[in-house]
Amino acid sequence: MINKIFALPVVEQLTPVLSRRQIDGADVIVVDHPRVKASVALNGAHLLSWKPEGEVEGLWLSDATSFKKGAAIRGGVPICWPWFGPSAQPGLPSHGFARNQQWTLKAHNEDDSGAVLTFELQANDETRALWPHDFTLYARFKLGKTCEIELEAHGEFETTSALHTYFNVGDISAVKVSGLGDTFIDKVDNAKEGKLSDGVQAFPDRTDRKSVV
């Protein structure tokens, strides 16, 4: 699927390294930079791919995913906002609505190291029907040798959020994650609390843990 995105015809050339393309009628911003190749769907401000120069693709994207308006894209980095997981109110979508809304490309900047893209989502009639708050939400992607994502919300409310990343992993037994703290809730083991002995999370078996920080 990622190769298909980069083979799409250019609808609008925004800069020498930035273009707008379409898949199934949905707009995708494609970064084709000497230092990095990446793509972001305007539906959900959803990072679909990120490949630094000389490296393998960092993200996984399902070949069967839908890009139709309002559909949740399977893979990449979904933005879960203004809540993560099931809603406390029955009938509302899991993981909020930001990932199913149409965002706008608000700003972009490119230099020798890569590109920075900023997308914006504002409250509208559809979001207010689900969540009665006015807001402006920005998603900022710094794409180069590394990938950094920032969410910036403006308004008066309380939220939870997540960047629900699908990594492209070769050998899961070789993967280790640090910096999450020592304490976790083990959802595989009836939500029992546990502690990492060295602060490093490995994946020898099925793992579904929530870090407590």
Give the predicted meaning of each segment.
Residues 38-40, 141, 147-155:
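Short, well-ordered beta-strand segments enriched in hydrophobic/aromatic residues
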Residues 1-73:
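Beta-strand-rich N-terminal accessory domains
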Residues 70-99, 178-192, 199-200:
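Beta-strand/loop-rich accessory regions of lumenal/periplasmic or secreted enzymes
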Residues 49-51, 156-163:
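Short, hydrophobic/aromatic beta-strand segments
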Residues 92-144:
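Extended, loop-rich substrate-binding clefts of extracytoplasmic carbohydrate-active enzymes
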Residues 23-25, 34, 44, 97-102, ...:
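Residues that act as N-cap/strand-start positions at coil-to-secondary-structure junctions
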Residues 54-57, 61, 127-134, 156, ...:
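Hydrophobic small-molecule pocket/channel-lining residues, especially in calycin-type beta-barrels
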Residues 158, 165-213:
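Active-site/ligand-binding surface loops and adjacent short beta/alpha elements
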